[in-house]
A protein has these predicted regions:
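Acidic, proline/glycine-enriched N-terminal capping motif
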Residues: 1-129
Length: 129
């Protein structure tokens, strides 16, 4: 299992749009930069592409806007879109394909240091008796 933290405001991987026949992500360059940061942090932590099923734990920390008083970030960006960006950023770094991910635990909270804490490891096989 490898553990690492990626500094920076998490960027969601939103829907794709077709403009003039080209498919683009709604976040464009910000998303590409965020996924690159994820890949670099994973490599620095010693990630190697797993060949077996993997499990992932993600803890997103969002910067609380000054005017917000609620305790939980129950607004955009959607947690599933944040997860999608991380999974794509780890493809070919921590596993060959994100289809190998068979278990995900994820949460998002407010905090002073925005980013995502990532844990990736081989999923232990279940033994039947």
């Amino acid at each position: 299992m490898i553990n690492f933290f990626v500094d920076g405001q998490p960027i969601p991987q939103g829907s794709m749009k077709v403009i003039n026949g080209y498919v683009i992500h709604s976040q464009g360059s910000a998303l590409a930069s965020w996924r690159s940061s994820i890949a670099l942090a994973a490599k620095a932590a010693g990630a190697k592409p797993h060949l077996e099923p993997v499990e992932i734990d993600l803890e997103f920390t969002m910067k609380r806007p000054r005017t917000v008083t609620r305790q939980e970030p129950s607004v955009a960006p959607d947690l599933d879109k944040l997860i999608r960006a991380v999974l794509d950023g780890l493809t070919a770094i921590a596993y060959r394909d994100d289809g190998q991910v068979t278990s995900i635990t994820a949460s998002k909270t407010y905090g002073e240091r925005p980013g995502v804490s990532v844990k990736v490891g081989a999923k232990l096989p279940v033994t039947l008796q």
